[in-house]
Amino acid sequence: MKAAIHQNHGLLTCSRHSIEAAAFWFIALERCCQQQLMIDATGVAPKLVPPDKARFSREHVGSEYIGWLHFQPIWGQLVATQPDMFD
């Protein structure tokens, strides 16, 4: 398990290998939640992803390495735009 949604508390993510991966999973889950709220606001029934396609996506995009890798541009942007972060 990489993430949990706690009622009245918010999101929690984790990683076995790196803080970067946990941070990326948090950002990705936050974006998913935002998308879900926008879909719900339309009043249209969402089109669900078939289980086999969801499983394929998890197996190819859900690895710890991919989480770490996808956080690298975010980290680069933070370092470039917030240099005082290290003071």
Model-derived features: positions:
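A conserved C-terminal secondary-structure "cap"
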Residues: 2-87
